[in-house]
Amino acid sequence: MSQLLHLHRLSLPQSSLRFRFPPLHRRRAASSPTNSTQPPLQFRPLTVSRSQITCRFSQSDITPQFELDKAKDNRKPQKRANGIFWIILINLGIYLADHFFQVRGIKSLYLYHNFPAWYQFVTATFCHANWNHLSSNLFFLYIFGKLVEEEEGNFGLWLSYLFTGVGANLVSWLVLPRNAVSVGASGAVFGLFAISVLVKMSWDWRKILEVLILGQFVIERVMEAAQASAGLSGTIYGGYSLQTVNHIAHLSGALVGVVLVWLLSKFPSASMDQDVKKSS
């Protein structure tokens, strides 16, 4: 039995039963650098300068968004037409106060050619003889007034309406007899028509054809409305006769509108100045 144990010990040497590792201090010495003067390792937070950061995008990823932003910037902001509705409401209010409620002193807003007050040249553009006269003027006032306001803004609309209306009344006062009375926005309507045509006009045969057809329609309708107000042609207010058709006001209103556009074209617009500054 002792011989068997002795043989077993000989067949299984001690070196085969153990896993030998180098000592810990030797492993550290082997892994550490030979230069003992090198400072120990220090852990620093990860920092990257901005100049080292580069982002790469493909053109297909960035171009569509750029084009969308550019289209939004170039899109013309839409202007809400509010001034024309205020002008229409003022005309309606004065008509109701004159013909329905018969407010005392409302007829002092008419333009009496014999001895006119300075404000009557303005207020007469908001007065009308009857409903046919008012409804026809308001129809074309809305169409052409909205066109002018979309291009020139609220202030431009009021300036055009008052300038052409006052100009038409002034020419009528100079030409018509002294016992005449002038009311109506027909002069301002023709003035707004001329301004809208000149502002939006482009030298295209389609646009010219539209202007000719629409201009003839406007003239006919306004003349019919003026003829429809013939019921007041013989009405006398303290020795004054209300004129039926004021052709002078119609033509002078359109002429004043042309003059207004010509005068405004002499002044550079704010948008042109901004474009020049941006380009420089």
From Swiss-Prot:
Question: Stromal face: residue ranges?
Answer: 58-82, 141-154, 200-243
Q: Where in the cell is it found?
A: Plastid, Chloroplast inner membrane
Q: What is its EC number?
A: 3.4.21.-
Q: Which GO terms describe its cellular component?
A: chloroplast; chloroplast inner membrane
Q: Which residues cross the membrane?
A: 83-103, 118-140, 155-175, 179-199, 244-264
User: Transit peptide, first to last residue?
Assistant: 1-57
**Active site at which residues?**
S186 (nucleophile), H250 (charge relay system)
Q: What class of enzyme is it?
A: hydrolase
Q: Which SUPFAM superfamilies match?
A: Rhomboid-like
User: Which domain of life does this protein belong to?
Assistant: Eukaryota
Instruction: Provide Chloroplast intermembrane-side residue ranges.
Output: 104-117, 176-178, 265-280
Q: Using the chain's own numbering, where are the disulfide bonds? A: none
Name its GO BP terms in alphabetical order: proteolysis; regulation of jasmonic acid metabolic process
Reported phenotype of the disruption mutant: No visible phenotype. Rbl10 and rbl11 double mutants have no visible phenotype.
GO molecular function of the protein, one example? protein domain specific binding
Q: Which family does it belong to?
A: Belongs to the peptidase S54 family.
**What does the subunit section of this Swiss-Prot or TrEMBL entry state?**
Homooligomer.
UniProt protein name:
Rhomboid-like protein 11, chloroplastic
Coding gene? RBL11
